[in-house]
Protein backbone atom coordinates (compact mmCIF):
# COMPACT_ATOMS: atom_id res chain seq x y z
CA UNK A 1 0.00 0.00 0.00
CA UNK A 2 1.17 3.50 -0.83
CA UNK A 3 -0.35 6.90 -0.19
CA UNK A 4 0.38 10.21 -1.84
CA UNK A 5 0.04 13.62 -0.26
CA UNK A 6 -0.44 16.61 -2.54
CA UNK A 7 1.28 19.51 -0.86
CA UNK A 8 3.11 22.23 -2.75
CA UNK A 9 5.23 22.86 0.36
CA UNK A 10 6.72 19.38 0.33
CA UNK A 11 7.22 16.54 2.78
CA UNK A 12 7.88 18.72 5.80
CA UNK A 13 4.32 20.08 5.62
CA UNK A 14 2.73 16.68 4.94
CA UNK A 15 4.70 14.69 7.53
CA UNK A 16 2.65 15.66 10.63
CA UNK A 17 -0.52 14.27 9.05
CA UNK A 18 1.14 11.00 8.09
CA UNK A 19 2.55 10.67 11.59
CA UNK A 20 -0.80 11.50 13.20
CA UNK A 21 -2.48 8.84 11.06
CA UNK A 22 0.17 6.33 12.21
CA UNK A 23 0.36 5.10 8.63
CA UNK A 24 1.99 1.69 8.33
CA UNK A 25 2.87 2.23 4.68
CA UNK A 26 4.92 4.60 2.55
CA UNK A 27 3.64 8.07 1.72
CA UNK A 28 5.09 10.00 -1.20
CA UNK A 29 4.59 13.75 -1.67
CA UNK A 30 3.42 15.27 -4.94
CA UNK A 31 4.70 18.85 -4.87
CA UNK A 32 4.00 19.47 -8.56
CA UNK A 33 0.29 18.45 -8.67
CA UNK A 34 1.24 15.68 -11.11
CA UNK A 35 -1.41 13.26 -9.89
CA UNK A 36 -4.18 15.80 -10.41
CA UNK A 37 -2.75 16.69 -13.81
CA UNK A 38 -2.59 13.03 -14.83
CA UNK A 39 -5.93 11.86 -13.48
CA UNK A 40 -7.87 15.10 -13.84
CA UNK A 41 -9.26 15.38 -10.31
CA UNK A 42 -9.76 18.73 -8.60
CA UNK A 43 -10.35 17.83 -4.99
CA UNK A 44 -8.98 15.39 -2.45
CA UNK A 45 -9.00 12.84 -0.89
CA UNK A 46 -9.10 10.21 -3.64
CA UNK A 47 -8.48 6.50 -3.94
CA UNK A 48 -6.73 4.67 -6.78
CA UNK A 49 -6.35 0.89 -6.56
CA UNK A 50 -3.53 -0.57 -8.61
CA UNK A 51 -2.95 -4.31 -8.63
CA UNK A 52 0.42 -6.07 -8.42
CA UNK A 53 0.74 -5.98 -12.22
CA UNK A 54 0.39 -2.19 -12.21
CA UNK A 55 -3.13 -2.18 -13.65
CA UNK A 56 -5.52 0.43 -12.31
CA UNK A 57 -8.52 -1.51 -11.01
CA UNK A 58 -10.60 1.20 -9.37
CA UNK A 59 -10.64 4.96 -8.96
CA UNK A 60 -12.79 6.99 -6.60
CA UNK A 61 -12.28 10.71 -6.95
CA UNK A 62 -13.31 12.97 -4.10
CA UNK A 63 -14.81 11.84 -0.87
CA UNK A 64 -12.66 8.83 -0.03
CA UNK A 65 -12.16 8.51 3.71
CA UNK A 66 -10.62 5.42 5.28
CA UNK A 67 -12.48 6.29 8.49
CA UNK A 68 -15.79 5.56 6.73
CA UNK A 69 -16.79 1.94 7.07
CA UNK A 70 -17.78 1.53 3.41
CA UNK A 71 -14.41 2.82 2.16
CA UNK A 72 -12.48 0.79 4.73
CA UNK A 73 -14.39 -2.38 3.77
CA UNK A 74 -13.72 -1.71 0.09
CA UNK A 75 -9.98 -1.34 0.75
CA UNK A 76 -9.98 -4.57 2.75
CA UNK A 77 -11.77 -6.44 -0.08
CA UNK A 78 -9.28 -5.09 -2.62
CA UNK A 79 -6.28 -6.12 -0.52
CA UNK A 80 -7.72 -9.60 -0.11
CA UNK A 81 -8.52 -10.00 -3.82
CA UNK A 82 -7.14 -7.19 -6.01
CA UNK A 83 -8.04 -8.84 -9.30
CA UNK A 84 -11.78 -9.16 -8.73
CA UNK A 85 -13.75 -8.25 -11.83
CA UNK A 86 -16.43 -6.29 -9.98
CA UNK A 87 -14.00 -3.43 -9.25
CA UNK A 88 -14.97 -0.77 -11.76
CA UNK A 89 -12.31 1.08 -13.66
CA UNK A 90 -12.69 4.77 -14.22
CA UNK A 91 -10.37 5.72 -17.04
CA UNK A 92 -11.14 9.45 -17.09
CA UNK A 93 -7.90 11.33 -17.52
CA UNK A 94 -6.95 14.89 -18.28
CA UNK A 95 -4.88 17.82 -17.09
CA UNK A 96 -7.11 18.63 -14.13
CA UNK A 97 -8.02 21.89 -15.86
CA UNK A 98 -10.82 22.72 -18.28
CA UNK A 99 -9.22 25.99 -19.32
CA UNK A 100 -5.67 25.77 -20.71
CA UNK A 101 -4.97 29.32 -19.49
CA UNK A 102 -5.77 28.22 -15.93
CA UNK A 103 -3.17 25.47 -16.37
CA UNK A 104 -0.65 28.10 -17.50
CA UNK A 105 -1.38 30.15 -14.36
CA UNK A 106 -0.93 27.04 -12.23
CA UNK A 107 2.40 26.19 -13.87
CA UNK A 108 3.56 29.81 -13.58
CA UNK A 109 2.73 29.68 -9.88
CA UNK A 110 4.71 26.46 -9.45
CA UNK A 111 7.74 28.01 -11.15
CA UNK A 112 7.47 31.09 -8.91
CA UNK A 113 7.11 28.95 -5.79
CA UNK A 114 10.18 26.87 -6.69
CA UNK A 115 12.16 30.12 -7.10
CA UNK A 116 11.06 31.18 -3.62
CA UNK A 117 8.67 33.90 -4.81
CA UNK A 118 5.64 32.88 -2.76
CA UNK A 119 3.78 36.13 -3.42
CA UNK A 120 3.97 35.69 -7.20
CA UNK A 121 3.02 32.02 -6.83
CA UNK A 122 -0.07 32.86 -4.79
CA UNK A 123 -1.08 35.54 -7.32
CA UNK A 124 -0.76 33.10 -10.22
CA UNK A 125 -2.66 30.37 -8.39
CA UNK A 126 -5.42 32.83 -7.51
CA UNK A 127 -5.72 33.60 -11.22
CA UNK A 128 -6.07 29.87 -11.91
CA UNK A 129 -8.74 29.49 -9.23
CA UNK A 130 -10.60 32.56 -10.53
CA UNK A 131 -10.85 30.77 -13.87
CA UNK A 132 -11.69 27.40 -12.31
CA UNK A 133 -13.31 27.97 -8.92
CA UNK A 134 -14.00 24.25 -8.46
CA UNK A 135 -10.29 23.39 -8.37
CA UNK A 136 -10.11 22.64 -4.65
CA UNK A 137 -6.55 21.36 -4.73
CA UNK A 138 -5.12 24.71 -5.76
CA UNK A 139 -7.55 26.65 -3.56
CA UNK A 140 -6.58 24.65 -0.47
CA UNK A 141 -2.87 24.95 -1.24
CA UNK A 142 -3.29 28.73 -1.46
CA UNK A 143 -5.00 28.68 1.92
CA UNK A 144 -2.34 26.38 3.43
CA UNK A 145 0.53 28.57 2.26
CA UNK A 146 -1.14 31.88 3.15
CA UNK A 147 -2.56 30.60 6.47
CA UNK A 148 -0.36 27.73 7.70
CA UNK A 149 -1.78 28.03 11.21
CA UNK A 150 -5.13 26.77 9.83
CA UNK A 151 -3.52 23.60 8.49
CA UNK A 152 -0.28 22.79 10.29
CA UNK A 153 -0.85 23.79 13.92
CA UNK A 154 -2.75 20.71 15.04
CA UNK A 155 -6.03 19.74 13.42
CA UNK A 156 -7.02 21.23 10.08
CA UNK A 157 -9.48 24.06 10.70
CA UNK A 158 -12.42 22.93 8.55
CA UNK A 159 -14.75 25.55 10.05
CA UNK A 160 -12.37 28.26 8.86
CA UNK A 161 -12.36 26.65 5.40
CA UNK A 162 -16.17 26.69 5.34
CA UNK A 163 -16.06 30.39 6.24
CA UNK A 164 -13.63 31.02 3.38
CA UNK A 165 -15.96 29.26 0.96
CA UNK A 166 -18.94 31.25 2.25
CA UNK A 167 -16.95 34.46 1.74
CA UNK A 168 -16.05 33.44 -1.82
CA UNK A 169 -12.35 32.93 -1.12
Model-derived regions: residue spans:
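Thiol-/selenol-based redox modules, centered on thioredoxin-like
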Residues: 51-123, 136, 146, 151
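Alpha-solenoid helical repeat scaffolds
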Residues: 106-107, 139-142, 157
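Alpha-helical linker/edge segments of TPR/alpha-solenoid repeat scaffolds
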Residues: 144-169
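Structural microenvironment flanking redox-active thiols in thiol-disulfide oxidoreductases
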Residues: 1-21, 31-35
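Thiol/disulfide oxidoreductase modules built on the thioredoxin-like
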Residues: 19-24, 30-74
Amino acid sequence: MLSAAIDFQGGKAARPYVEKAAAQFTTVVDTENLLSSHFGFRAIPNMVFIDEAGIIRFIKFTGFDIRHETDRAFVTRFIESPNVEHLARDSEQGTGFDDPIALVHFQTGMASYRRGDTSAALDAWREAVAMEPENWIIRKQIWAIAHPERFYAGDVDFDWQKDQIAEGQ
